């Protein structure tokens, strides 16, 4: 083997080896798209104080729905780095619904019909008669985004909403609760 050929192979080897030495830069969290190509009425608000954006495709998928099905139109996943206060309007006759999945960062105001329309909440899903507040636990993941449209019983339809909602994957039946320090604030509105 000639000197030129050995030098060339050595340089190629060094170049390939050097390319493997540096780890790739961390990937930015994926920017979620609207489901089914639907146009969302709003955008995802910035991370709330006490949260950082994370990538969790399974949780995001659980919070999104196609048009007419409620849930979120688009969203981003966050992880609580400090307790974060959230509010929930629910049905008092169904006590198990107090620790549900859908919350708000802002204290809800009435009237109930306006709140229902702004958040695309079908009447058969909740009577919206009781208000509670809790804090999202440190380390818990949640999704934030604008509401998807909802087709309800009796031909009631709510359009997609720019109002950001908070999805916390609570499941009290399975013992999975990601909120704490809950207080029932009473009848609503």
Language-model features: where?
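Conserved NAD+-utilizing ADP-ribose enzyme module
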Residues: 22-72, 97-98, 109-189
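Bacterial N-terminal signal peptides that target proteins for export
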Residues: 1-9
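Alpha-helical transmembrane segments
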Residues: 10-14
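C-terminal motif of bacterial Sec signal peptides marking the signal peptidase cleavage site
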Residues: 16-19
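Secreted/periplasmic proteins that engage bacterial cell-wall peptidoglycan
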Residues: 75-113
